[in-house]
C-alpha cells in the first residue's frame, strides 16, 4: 500500500479523472485523489494524493500554480481556448502593438483581479455547472470572482502571421484562476478578440515538471517495486501552513487525543491554522485551527494517528 503525494505528468487528451482511474488500476488501490482539475487539452503537473496523503489534498490545492500559455490575438472562441468554435475575428498587424505594449499591459494584471469564469467551465451557478448550460446553448449570468495573479510576464517574441499575433506568457497564480480567460481579457485590453491556444501547467502545489512522472513511468516503477521512492511524504503537502515542532511527549499525547489548547501554550500569534510536527520523527501529528467562537483557543481540524 502506497502513502504519499505523486506528481504526475498529465498528457494532453486525458482528463484528470482518467489519470486517477488509470492509477487505481496500475497501483490496485482506490484511495487516490487528484488535487485540482486540468482540462483534457492541457498538459503538465497534476499532484495525486495516495493512501493517507488524500487527507491533505485540499492543502496541496491551495498552494498555488504556475503555467506557460500561448496567447493568440485576432480570434475569439466559444470556449476561450483552441478547442472552441470561432466567435469573432479581427486582423492583427505588427503596426497595431509591439512587445513593449504587451509588457506594460501585463503589469496591469498583477495582483488580485476579477475574472468572469468561461461558460465552458465547472463553476456552478444555481447548482448547475456552467458547461451544462453551454452544451444546451443556454447563457446565464456569471458572477465575477477574485483571483490572485502573483506574477505574469511575456517569455517569447511576438509572432505575427495570418492576421493573428501569438506570444507566450508565464503566470504564477492562486487557485481558481482561468488562464484562458486571462488570454481573452488581454485581447480585450488591446482591442482585439483573443483566445488561449496552448497551455502547460509547469508547477502545482510546489511540484514541478522535473518531479513529474508519466503514467507509463509510474507503471514501470511499480512493477520494479521502486515507486515508493518517488512519492513525497504528506508533510510536503502542508508546507504552505505555519508549523510548530513538538518535543514534549505529554503534549504530543494531548494533540493525538484531539484536545483543545490555549493559544498562549504555543504561539499566541496563531491566526488561522497550525501544523504540529513530531520533533523526533518529523511526522505530522495534527492540523489545528483557531476556535470559531473562542479566539484564545485552538481546536483540532485533522489528527494523524
Curated annotation (Swiss-Prot):
Classification via InterPro entries: PsdUridine_synth_cat_dom_sf, PsdUridine_synth_N, tRNA_psdUridine_synth_TruB, TruB_C
Highest taxon above the source species: Bacteria
Catalytic activity: uridine(55) in tRNA = pseudouridine(55) in tRNA
Key word Nucleotide-binding present: no
GO MF annotation terms: RNA binding; tRNA pseudouridine(55) synthase activity
Alphabetized UniProt keyword annotations: Isomerase, tRNA processing
Segments crossing the lipid bilayer: none
EC number: 5.4.99.25
Active site residues per record: 39 (nucleophile)
Primary enzyme class: isomerase
Disulfides per UniProt: none
This protein's record includes keyword Isomerase: yes
One BP term from GO: mRNA pseudouridine synthesis
Function: Responsible for synthesis of pseudouridine from uracil-55 in the psi GC loop of transfer RNAs.
Family classification: Belongs to the pseudouridine synthase TruB family. Type 1 subfamily.
Protein's name according to its UniProt entry: tRNA pseudouridine synthase B
Organism in which the protein naturally occurs: Staphylococcus aureus (strain JH9)
Amino acid at each position: 500500500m502506497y502513502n504519499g503525494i505523486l506528481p504526475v505528468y498529465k498528457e494532453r487528451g486525458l482528463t484528470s479523472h482518467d489519470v486517477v482511474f488509470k492509477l487505481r488500476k496500475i497501483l490496485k488501490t482506490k484511495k487516490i485523489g487528484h488535487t485540482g482539475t486540468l482540462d483534457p487539452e492541457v498538459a503538465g503537473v497534476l499532484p495525486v494524493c495516495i493512501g493517507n496523503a488524500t487527507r491533505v489534498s485540499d492543502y496541496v490545492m491551495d498552494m498555488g500554480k504556475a503555467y506557460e500559455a500561448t496567447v493568440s490575438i485576432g480570434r475569439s472562441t466559444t470556449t476561450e481556448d483552441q478547442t472552441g468554435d470561432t466567435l469573432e475575428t479581427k486582423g492583427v498587424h505588427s503596426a497595431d502593438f509591439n512587445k513593449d505594449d504587451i509588457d506594460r499591459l501585463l503589469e496591469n494584471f498583477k495582483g488580485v483581479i476579477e475574472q468572469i469564469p468561461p461558460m465552458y467551465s465547472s463553476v456552478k451557478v444555481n447548482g448547475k455547472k456552467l458547461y451544462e448550460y453551454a452544451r444546451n446553448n443556454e447563457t446565464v449570468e456569471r458572477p465575477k470572482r477574485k483571483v490572485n495573479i502573483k506574477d505574469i510576464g511575456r517569455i517569447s517574441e511576438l509572432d505575427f502571421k495570418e492576421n493573428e499575433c501569438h506570444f507566450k506568457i508565464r503566470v504564477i497564480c492562486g487557485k481558481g484562476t482561468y488562464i484562458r480567460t486571462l488570454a481573452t481579457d488581454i485581447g480585450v485590453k488591446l482591442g482585439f478578440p483573443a483566445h488561449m491556444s496552448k497551455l502547460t501547467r509547469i508547477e502545482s502545489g510546489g511540484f514541478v515538471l522535473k518531479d513529474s512522472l508519466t503514467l507509463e513511468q509510474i507503471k514501470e516503477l511499480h512493477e520494479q517495486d521502486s515507486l515508493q521512492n518517488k512519492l513525497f511524504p504528506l508533510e510536503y503537502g502542508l508546507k504552505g501552513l505555519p508549523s510548530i515542532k513538538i518535543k514534549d511527549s505529554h503534549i504530543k499525547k494531548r494533540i493525538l487525543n484531539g484536545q483543545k489548547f490555549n493559544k498562549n501554550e504555543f504561539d499566541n500569534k496563531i491566526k488561522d491554522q497550525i501544523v504540529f510536527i513530531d520533533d523526533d520523527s518529523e511526522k505530522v501529528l495534527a492540523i489545528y485551527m483557531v476556535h470559531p467562537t473562542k479566539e484564545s483557543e485552538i481546536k483540532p481540524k485533522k489528527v494523524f494517528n
